[in-house]
Amino acid sequence: LARREREPERIGFADIAGLEDLKRTVRLQIIEPFLKPGLFAKFRKRAGGGVLLYGPPGCGKTMIARAVATECRAEFMTVGISDVLNMYIGESERNLAAIFDKARHARPCVLFFDEIDALAYSRSKAQSEHTRQVVNEFLAQLDGFGTDNQEVLILAATNMPWDVDPAMKRPGRFSRQVFVPPPDEAARAHIVELKLRGVPHEGVDGREIAARTRHFSGADIEGVVELAKDYVLEDHLTREVERPIGQADLLRAAEATEATTLDWLRTARNLVKYAGADDSYKDVEAYLRQHKLV
């Protein structure tokens, strides 16, 4: 079922370059309430509950969740689709109940559900009764139906927040939703440096690569570095020219790569512009306006 994070894999906000606005939001809305429940209790605000991280694929939602657990000094437990869904009637619901029970026994704990849209798909769109039953059980667990979720911070990630059942976003469930945008320029430069660590390279300016990769996800940046490696290896194998990765290789790779976030951003733009989306997506709208995508 839920998998506990091994200590060597734990990272904190100090390990994440850039994204200062996002880190500030996460600290104020998620981490501080968890670390200082007494202060928030004075205002009838309690730690725990659920937070939905959403945004384009490959932009570090899982990394942010891991960092939150580290900053909260809490156990990190991650749950994937295969940990829950089962073909036999009732087994998926039992798996969910067991996962929440395990988290309560590990408190303080951050319980992270990846690809939540697959586990909590909108019941109005679902054609399967099994899907609806899983969502019902998920809602019951979030409500702490007959149990206690205090000191259990529930995080979830999705690339498709519009497919998540609306009931999941009501108060006390995943009522807090945090937009995780594509990495900013500082973060992109850091990713380039990180992916080149231990790899022969020379004269690389990560800042220039970052400037040429607007809207690229972290996964896109990794793809650029991998493509640059291919260029160098091709020279090794076909021309017997041994050399490190250079700036020209990375710029060529960046030019040959398209940002995979653009399709997501177009979908989000249409949702904000034409579908009459509520304030849930105001952060997305602000991002689109800031980057002149609307």
Could you describe each region identified by the protein language model?
Residues 6-212, 216:
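Walker A/P-loop NTP-binding motif of AAA+ ATPase domains
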Residues 3-27, 37-43, 211-223, 235-294:
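C-terminal engagement/docking regions of AAA+ P-loop ATPases
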Residues 230-231:
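Juxtamembrane/transmembrane-helix interface segments of polytopic membrane transporters
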